[in-house]
Amino acid sequence: MLLLGILLLIFNPFHKSPDERALSELGFIKGTCNDSDASTATPDSECLALRAKPTMTASQVAAALPHLKNSDRKIELNLGGTQIDNLDSLKGLDDLESLDLTNTPVWNIDALKEMHSLKRLVLHRTDVENIAALKGLTGLQSLNLWDTRVSNLDALKNLRDLRELDLRDTQVRDLNPLEDLPHLETLKLGGARNVRNVDALSQLSSLQTLDLNETQVDSISELKKLRGLQALYLANTPLRDIDALKGMSSLRTLVLDGSKVDDIDAAQGMLQLNTLVLARTQVTNIDALKGLTGLQRLNLADTRVENIEALTDLKSLRMLNLFRTRVRNIEPLRGLTGLQELYLANTPVEDVDALKGLTGLRELVLYGTQVRNVDDLKAALPKTRIVW
């Protein structure tokens, strides 16, 4: 019994103080803190992470406030999934560094005006439209407004410490308020269908990840200054010209599927490129990919590509999607022994002898082809899942 008591004391997440026990009784579950500057865990001695049960009410949050104020640690509070719609009970919580309100009926965030300790705020899937209350929160480093009604970003002009900003599926149109955010590293605008002009982003020298999927962006000429960009997403946009990307040697991920792009010469020399998605584009010539020895994932599905000789020496390729292309000759793949996934469905391919030495293949999709020697291929690749 003594041993059991000791174990319970050690593993009980709220054994440290009466305040934490009270918080547990009110419906809070203790979690793991994350460093605001990284993905590493922060010691419990420095941080208190609390997640509310879905049944949490505003009155319970109000009752928790005195106990939260007694903490000498920074606080990360997750109220996501609750029915809390009023934040007044949080006023005076000076040590709050992270607040997650995902999928709550919150619409008014005026109660956050004086929370200058906030570094991370998540308003994903709330009814928030007006974010004027944030204009003085200059310590904010991460702000998530995904799937909200927000359209005006003026309040963000002076939040110069922002590192991450998620504006996906918002009503945002004017990006000028973002032009002077020197530390912004990640900007997500996917699904913000009113966005057309991204010239204001040209001065964001720290930007590493930019998501413009499902926007109306048709020109990226001003983005040529973003030499530190590592990931760029432009799926399902009216974009045709990617010449601005020439010389962007830091790019690791480039997603263009469903765009109007037909020329990828700008990809020449992108030696760091790891993932390239060209599905459903007008691309027919992939010679620009010669020499991109770092490429691991290439998607050419639903294009008119016919010749894949440019892939002959791309030994790092792990996934290749040629679904519904015009490729007939796959001899250039013979030496790509690192391939793990190969999709050849609905192509004119007939001869697959070139694949017999690719013993690392985990999945090979051949349905909709005229391949005749599948039995021989199965014998040569006993560990490969072949779908045909």
Ranges and model annotations:
Residues 31-37, 45-63, 72-89, 95-111, ...:
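Concave beta-strand-loop units of leucine-rich repeat
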Residues 10-13, 27, 92, 322:
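Intrinsic disorder/low-structure terminal segments
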Residues 22-25, 63-67:
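Charge-rich, solvent-exposed alpha-helical interaction surfaces
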Residues 1-10:
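Hydrophobic membrane-insertion alpha-helices, especially the h-region
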